[in-house]
């Protein structure tokens, strides 16, 4: 059990993955994430460390490669934020997602809540013929 919460250096390490480098191991995730972690992003919601690790493994497996670059980290009390850029290579095409993660640290110092905020639709469907035009039209009508 950890006595101190996850540090900025720990988050820098967790949220940095160059192309061609392996993702963190299950033991690495378990060192920093609570067994009952809640994970939410624009595409899914998972409860528990094993479900979180499974979600990360599935992302890596369905991509040719993944990168994650950290830009800024802030921790105040039991809350942390990480600004990042994620790149996914799928069938030779690269998709870039800028985003932010909000983390809540539990009494044991581990991450008990992890929520990712990023635009899934624009970078995913924008480059696709026909879907890209529809996505941009929807954005122009309802978002921009």
Give residue ranges: language-model regions.
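Short acidic-aromatic low-complexity motifs
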Residues: 2-35
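Residue-level preference for long, well-ordered alpha-helices that form the structural scaffold
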Residues: 4-7, 48, 135
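A generic structural signal for ordered secondary structure
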Residues: 7-18, 56, 68, 99-101
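Flexible interhelical turns and helix-capping residues at alpha-helix boundaries
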Residues: 19-22, 41, 92
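A solvent-exposed, acidic/Ser-Thr-rich amphipathic alpha-helical stretch
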Residues: 26-78
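Intrinsically disordered, low-complexity regulatory regions of eukaryotic regulatory proteins
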Residues: 2, 39, 114-117
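Exposed alpha-helical structural elements
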Residues: 10, 28, 51, 130-134
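A beta-strand edge to alpha-helix "cap/lid" segment located at domain peripheries
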Residues: 61-67, 74-144
